């Protein structure tokens, strides 16, 4: 089994970006979606990117953003990859001259082969849980058996992953990459996720689980 790549999404602080990089993350995600508790400004994102070591991919996440908003971010932040998490059409996704991935929320009637055909120019499909009214970061898993083994695009598995279940997810789905956000965050006093503040120890355990399971191939 090829060792899956790991993206730590929803980075809001320099120290969390460094914790991800130092733990072996292949990519970090920066959220440019105002309603998200993990949203960052272009200035914050630029500072986070400037702190990263070489060869860590920076991913900018947008949800039905305007062209002007996306171009404004690209003018200020050294983004390697775009992630479209809304209802963006393939022509729009293609128009920024950057590699991009398209998120697919797993409603009951989703046909991933159909999405792969429509978004054929994507660098991959990010397959996420569906929760009505929540475009991402749901903390919920979905039935991993719904992911076909024969998709023509690389699969980025997301949705409710955490250190305790990611090894099983990798074994079953055998994705090209995995994406985690809330599953590696600190807990607040109520026991819920902090909404952007990462737990460096959880990041290390998560990445080790992915890399070990990928190498073992079991």
From Swiss-Prot:
Family designation: Belongs to the TrpF family.
Q: InterPro entries from the xrefs?
A: Aldolase_TIM, PRAI_dom, RibuloseP-bd_barrel, TrpF_fam
Pathway terms, separated by semicolons: Amino-acid biosynthesis; L-tryptophan biosynthesis; L-tryptophan from chorismate: step 3/5
- The protein's name in its UniProt record: N-(5'-phosphoribosyl)anthranilate isomerase
Oxidoreductase as a keyword of this entry, yes or no, is no
Q: What is its EC number?
A: 5.3.1.24
Gene3D superfamilies in the record, alphabetically? Aldolase class I
Q: Does the keyword Amino-acid biosynthesis apply?
A: yes
> What are the GO BP annotations of this UniProt entry?
L-tryptophan biosynthetic process
Looking up PANTHER family in the UniProt record yields: N-(5'-PHOSPHORIBOSYL)ANTHRANILATE ISOMERASE
User: GO molecular-function annotation terms?
Assistant: phosphoribosylanthranilate isomerase activity
A Pfam family of the record is PRAI
For this protein, what reaction is catalysed?
A: N-(5-phospho-beta-D-ribosyl)anthranilate = 1-(2-carboxyphenylamino)-1-deoxy-D-ribulose 5-phosphate
What SUPFAM superfamilies would the database entry show? Ribulose-phoshate binding barrel
Alphabetically list the UniProt keywords.
Amino-acid biosynthesis, Aromatic amino acid biosynthesis, Isomerase, Tryptophan biosynthesis
């Amino acid at each position: 089994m090829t060792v899956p790549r790991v993206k730590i999404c929803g980075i809001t602080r320099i120290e969390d970006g460094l914790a991800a990089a130092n733990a072996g993350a292949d990519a970090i995600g920066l959220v440019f979606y105002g309603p998200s508790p993990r949203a960052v400004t272009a200035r914050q994102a630029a500072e986070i990117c400037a702190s990263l070591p070489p060869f860590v991919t920076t991913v900018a996440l947008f949800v039905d953003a305007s062209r002007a908003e996306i171009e404004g971010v690209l003018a200020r932040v050294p983004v390697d990859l775009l992630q479209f998490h809304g209802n963006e059409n393939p022509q729009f996704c293609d128009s920024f001259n950057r590699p991009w991935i398209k998120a697919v929320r797993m409603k009951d009637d989703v046909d991933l082969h159909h999405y792969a055909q429509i978004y054929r120019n994507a660098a991959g499909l990010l397959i996420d849980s569906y929760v009505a009214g929540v475009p991402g970061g749901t903390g919920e898993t979905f039935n991993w058996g719904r992911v076909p083994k024969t998709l023509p695009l690389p699969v980025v598995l997301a949705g409710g992953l955490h250190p305790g279940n990611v090894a099983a997810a990798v074994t079953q789905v055998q994705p090209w990459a995995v994406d985690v956000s809330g599953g590696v965050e600190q807990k607040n006093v109520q026991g819920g996720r902090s909404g952007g503040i990462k737990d460096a120890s959880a990041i290390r355990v998560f990445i080790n689980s992915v890399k070990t399971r990928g190498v073992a191939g079991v």
